[in-house]
Amino acid sequence: MKTLTDTFGRKFPYIRLSITDVCNYKCTYCLPQGYKKNPGDTRSFMKGEEIARLTKALSELGVCKIRLTGGEPTVRKDFFDILKDMKQNSNIPKVTMTTNGYRLNKIAKQLHEFGLDGINISIDSLNRETFKKLTGHDRLLEILEGIKILQELNFKNIKVNAVLLKGINDTHADFEKFGNFIKNNEIDFRFIELMQTGDNLDYFKKNHVSSKIFRDYLEKNNWIHQTFGKDAGPSLNFIHPDYKGKFGVIAPYSKDFCKTCNRLRITSRGDLRLCLFGNTGISIRHLLQNDSQKNELVDLILNQLHLKKESHYLELGETGLTKNLSTTGG
């Protein structure tokens, strides 16, 4: 089997597949003014049949995990059709999703029934008012209800992501609140460092804080760093004997962050992106129009990997093509 391997020996069994740029939230660090269509890009989002052809080709390249992202993937009316086809026909062993959770309490049972293998839910604060200020929506209680429903269904792979923000969720009291949340819940909670994108420089300068503050808290409170294989990805994971859940840290500005990169990205309009913050992307959509194009599609993807750089160079202020995280499925 052909596999996705770059010139630095990194393998890419994991694809983050955006199926829409649209998001109904107004998160302060991503889309503070809400979603606005890019007038310079008139292309539609990939159709269900195009996504189906894409995932079948990816399965022949050793891809074993696809994460559906956006925007907010569940705003697509055919979201469950896409999920169902991917689970039944693509030969991809693991299909997961990232969501803001706005419909989670209503669709949790369907997600379970359709065979979703894992879910990442964005919750930047467990304080209802703070959550509302950050997202523009007073939906925290509904999201927590959705998580509870998933747990009652014995849904195992639940992760909660929070962007670490200065003065908002970066105190020991905040960390303890999240710790209490996972103490008796088998949930992986991960803090993600705020990343600079093309349109958030001022916000980044004001609100970025190093994840070291959280790692120091974990060390002080006897959390144990958990190590995995070299293909496990860039997250640092921590366990504690008194907690059912786990803590994680994603620190893109840390040294050697890109050494363990194991993923590629495909945008909702069918562009292959080798890096979230890369300067290059190539459209593969023209090879998603007919089943007979699969071999050509496989070859095109393979031939792009030599262009993948060793690092994202975020520390140099390079944000590449990423205007905001909704456009590339952060």
Region spans (language model):
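Auxiliary Fe-S-binding modules of radical SAM enzymes
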Residues: 1-14, 183-184, 194-330
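Canonical Radical SAM [4Fe-4S] cluster-binding loop centered on the CxxxCxxC motif
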Residues: 7-46, 276
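Residue-level signature of catalytic and energy-coupling elements of molecular machines
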Residues: 19, 189, 270
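Glycine-centered loop/turn positions within well-structured domains
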Residues: 25, 128-129, 256, 282
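Residues that scaffold the ATP/ADP-binding catalytic core of kinase and kinase-like folds
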Residues: 26, 30, 76, 129, ...
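Residue-level recognition of short loop/turn positions
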Residues: 26, 70, 269-270
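A short acidic, helix-capping loop that chelates divalent metal ions and anchors anionic groups
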Residues: 36-41, 127-134, 198-202, 283-284
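Radical SAM/AdoMet-radical enzyme domain recognition
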Residues: 45-68, 72-192
